Curated annotation (Swiss-Prot):
CDD domains tied to this protein: STKc_CDK1_euk
GO annotation (BP), single: cell division
Residues with the Phosphothreonine modification: 14, 161
Record's keyword terms, sorted: ATP-binding, Cell cycle, Cell division, Cytoplasm, Cytoskeleton, Kinase, Mitosis, Nucleotide-binding, Nucleus, Phosphoprotein, Serine/threonine-protein kinase, Transferase
Free-text function comment from the UniProt entry: Plays a key role in the control of the eukaryotic cell cycle by modulating the centrosome cycle as well as mitotic onset; promotes G2-M transition via association with multiple interphase cyclins. During G2 and early mitosis, CDC25A/B/C-mediated dephosphorylation activates CDK1/cyclin complexes which phosphorylate several substrates that trigger at least centrosome separation, Golgi dynamics, nuclear envelope breakdown and chromosome condensation.
Protein name, as recorded: Cyclin-dependent kinase 1
Post-translational modifications reported in the UniProt record: Phosphorylation at Tyr-15 by wee1 and wee2 inhibits the protein kinase activity and acts negative regulator of entry into mitosis (G2 to M transition).
E.C. code: 2.7.11.22, 2.7.11.23
Assembly and binders: Forms a stable but non-covalent complex with a regulatory subunit and with a cyclin.
Subcellular location: Nucleus; Cytoplasm, Cytoskeleton, Microtubule organizing center, Centrosome
Length: 302
C-alpha cells in the first residue's frame, strides 16, 4: 500500500469505501476500493483473491481497468483506473425536462454491450449492473465497473452502510430464485438501464423482491409456463401471484424510437433462453445509423 496515497473519500460502494488516490511514483490518479466483508474475522477468502486476480486480465476500452490487488492489515484493496463521474450522477445532473441526445443514448448502449460481450466471451458475468457502476468520461466513453465482484464476494443484501442493494435492474429469474442463471441476467439489466438512460427514470423501481417482480409483471403480464417454460417450478414462484395482463412498453418508456423499443423488448424477454444475446443486440437495426468508427472498441477482439 506504500505505493499509493489516499487523497479523499469519494463514495461508498456495495463492498466498502472508495477513495480517490494517487500512485506515488507516477502521479497516476486511481480509485481505491477498500473491501469490507461480512465475516471479517476470517480474513479474505483465498477464492475471492483468485477470482479478483483473474479480473486483471479483463482489458477492454469499455471496462474499468483493475490495476492492482493489495492486502494491508488483512484488508483487501482493489486499485482501479479513475473516472470521476458515474451514469447515475450524470443523469441526475441533467435539468428537468431535458434528456440525453438520442445518438449519445445509442452510443452508450452500444459501448455497454461491447464491454459485456467481451466479459461473457470469457465466462465472466457481472450480475449487478446498474447506473452507479457505469462510469463515464468527458469524451462520451462509458465503462463497466465492478465486474466479477459479485462472484468473488457474493451480492450482499445490504451495503455495509445498511443501505439496501437496489433490485431495480435485477432479472426476473434471479428474483424468482433461479440458481442456474447465466449471461442473460446481464442483458436484462442492460435493457432496464437503456430505458433509464433515455427517459431519466427507472423502468421498474420496486422496494422489495416481490414488489420488483410485481412491477415487471404489471408491464409484461404475470409470467407462466406458457411464456416461460418451467418458470412455475422456480423456488420463489407462487401460483397466488396476481394475474396481470400486461401493458405497453411504448406507454412506459419515453424518448426511445420504434427500433429502440423493438430492441428493448427483446432484451426484456421473460424467458432467459429467448432473451436476445448481447452479441445479437449489437447487430440490431437500432444501431444502423451510429458511427461506430469513433468508438473506443470499434474492433472487438475475442
Amino acid at each position: 500500500m506504500d505505493e499509493y496515497a489516499k487523497i479523499e473519500k469519494i463514495g461508498e460502494g456495495t463492498y466498502g469505501v472508495v477513495y480517490k488516490g494517487v500512485h506515488k511514483a507516477t502521479g497516476q490518479i486511481v480509485a481505491m476500493k477498500k473491501i469490507r466483508l461480512e465475516n471479517e474475522e476470517e480474513g479474505v477468502p483465498s477464492t475471492a483473491i483468485r477470482e479478483i486476480s483473474l479480473l486483471k486480465e479483463l482489458q477492454h476500452p469499455n471496462i474499468v481497468c483493475l490495476l492492482d490487488v493489495l492486502m494491508q492489515d488483512s484488508r483487501l484493496y482493489l486499485i482501479f483506473e479513475f473516472l470521476s463521474m458515474d451514469l447515475k450522477k450524470y443523469l441526475d445532473s441533467i435539468p428537468s425536462g431535458q434528456y440525453l441526445e438520442a445518438m449519445l443514448v445509442k452510443s452508450y448502449l452500444y459501448q455497454i454491450l461491447q464491454g459485456i460481450i467481451f466479459c461473457h466471451a470469457r465466462r465472466v458475468l457481472h450480475r449487478d449492473l446498474k447506473p452507479q457502476n457505469l462510469l463515464i468520461d468527458s469524451k462520451g466513453v462509458i465503462k463497466l465497473a465492478d465486474f466479477g465482484l459479485a462472484r468473488a464476494f457474493g451480492i450482499p443484501v445490504r451495503v455495509y452502510t445498511h443501505e439496501v442493494v437496489t433490485l431495480w435492474y435485477r432479472a426476473p429469474e434471479v428474483l424468482l430464485g433461479s440458481v442456474r442463471y447465466s449471461t442473460p441476467v446481464d442483458v436484462w439489466s442492460i435493457g432496464t438501464i437503456f430505458a433509464e438512460i433515455a427517459s431519466k427514470k427507472p423502468l421498474f423501481h420496486g422496494d422489495s423482491e416481490i414488489d420488483q417482480l410485481f412491477r415487471i409483471s404489471e408491464l409484461w403480464g404475470t409470467p407462466n409456463n406458457e411464456v416461460w417454460p418451467e418458470v412455475e417450478s422456480l423456488q420463489d414462484y407462487k401460483n397466488t401471484f396476481p394475474k396481470w395482463k400486461g401493458g405497453s412498453l411504448a406507454a412506459n418508456v419515453k424518448n426511445i424510437d420504434k427500433e429502440g423499443l423493438d430492441l428493448l423488448a427483446k432484451m426484456l424477454v421473460y424467458d432467459p433462453a429467448k432473451r436476445i444475446s448481447a452479441r445479437k443486440a449489437l447487430l440490431h437495426p437500432y444501431f444502423d445509423d451510429l458511427d461506430k468508427s469513433s468508438l473506443p472498441a470499434n474492433q472487438i477482439r475475442n
